[in-house]
């Protein structure tokens, strides 16, 4: 991995999670560029080289190791890495979904972004259709995407879901199913190794996984901070 070519990291954004994924990618690019600048300055100082010429040498080495025959990008400037995997999502009029990975992801660590509570109109089929998707639609879109990523040869699959779907169905009362646990088992059977989510209120969901790791992050402070900008919380 270099700061211009993150060879093992890729992001697949489901239609519902694309806006969120794009925000994350902006921050990732900023982090990569900052780290590269620090590395470039340190190497230039250590080997007594001009920083611009060193940048050109680094780009040259990157081009030498690139598998593509057609090299793109500036010769003497930093090249921002591309994390987003080219993916085509198809929505059929009967409600079915299809996901097709359009580039090689074999051996990569893939993070799939999905926001099941995104109820805005989402452009699908290349922008030809704009549809409001339900939670069930988002979940099914996520499942077919996981399967496509797995069959494309990804080394590791992680899910980034700000809202864990069906988290309301985490306790059994009478003759009812545990859908939150069921989804966890489906994810594991599809090869998911990690799930990153926010503020799961139930320990039962976290304990329902046999193999996959679940990272339950807390966003209470960030939410209150943003709310305080538009609502007076002191009264």
Over which residues does each language-model region extend?
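PRPP-associated nucleotide enzymes
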Residues: 1-235
């Amino acid at each position: 991995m270099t700061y211009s070519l993150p060879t093992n990291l890729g992001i697949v954004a489901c239609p519902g999670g694309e806006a969120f994924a794009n925000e994350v990618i902006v921050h990732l690019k900023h982090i990569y560029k900052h780290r590269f600048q620090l590395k470039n300055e340190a190497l230039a100082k250590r080997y007594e080289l001009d920083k611009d010429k060193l940048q050109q040498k680094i780009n040259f080495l990157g081009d030498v190791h690139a598998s593509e025959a057609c090299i793109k990008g500036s010769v003497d400037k930093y090249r921002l890495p591309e994390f987003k995997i080219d993916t085509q999502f198809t929505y059929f009029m009967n409600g079915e979904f299809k996901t097709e990975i359009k580039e090689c992801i074999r051996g990569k660590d893939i993070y799939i972004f999905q926001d099941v509570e995104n109820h805005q109109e989402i452009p699908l089929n290349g922008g030809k259709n704009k549809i409001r998707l339900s939670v069930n639609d988002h979940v099914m879109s996520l499942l077919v995407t996981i399967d496509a990523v797995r069959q494309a040869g990804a080394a590791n699959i992680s899910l980034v879901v700000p809202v864990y779907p069906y988290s309301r169905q985490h306790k059994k009362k009478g003759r009812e199913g545990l859908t939150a646990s069921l989804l966890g088992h489906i994810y594991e059977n599809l090869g998911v190794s990690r799930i990153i989510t926010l503020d799961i209120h139930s320990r039962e969901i976290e304990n329902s996984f046999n193999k996959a790791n679940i990272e339950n992050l807390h966003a209470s402070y960030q939410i209150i901070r943003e709310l305080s900008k538009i609502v007076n919380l002191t009264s």
